[in-house]
């Protein structure tokens, strides 16, 4: 199956997010983050957005930057922000099975080869959010 995705980078690796779940991409000063109940949040005008740092989730050292790149993702009626190092753009990808070592791990939906020939893991948005409840 072909899946429209948004490619994002965390550390040296590229990951694919299903485009249907992407609401918007924000850039916010790192100093604008707040904390609620032990979790990072971003105060928006109309609501507070819970954040998941993809780099921390993956165990990758974050690139220190005064400006955060946040991909806002939809999960059911809720939204959350995924902090990434950079957004690489949209790409339609062919979904392939996960490598054996990653099967059954929460947060991964499949794998794909992207335009530059590298493998990118397709992230399961529900699995990423699952650790926040």
Predicted regions and their residues:
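Conserved secondary-structure micro-motifs at functional edges
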Residues: 1-133
């Amino acid at each position: 199956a072909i899946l429209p995705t948004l490619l994002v980078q965390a550390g040296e690796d590229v990951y694919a997010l299903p485009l249907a779940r992407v609401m918007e991409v924000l850039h916010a000063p790192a100093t604008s983050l707040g904390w609620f109940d032990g979790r990072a949040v971003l105060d928006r005008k109309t609501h507070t957005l819970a954040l998941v740092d993809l780099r921390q989730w993956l165990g990758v050292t974050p690139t220190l930057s005064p400006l955060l790149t946040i991909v806002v993702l939809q999960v059911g009626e809720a939204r959350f922000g995924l902090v990434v190092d950079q957004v690489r753009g949209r790409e339609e990808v062919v979904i392939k099975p996960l490598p054996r070592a990653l099967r059954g791990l929460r947060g991964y939906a499949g794998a794909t080869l992207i335009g530059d020939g590298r493998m990118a893991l397709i992230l399961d948005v529900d699995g990423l959010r699952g650790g926040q409840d």
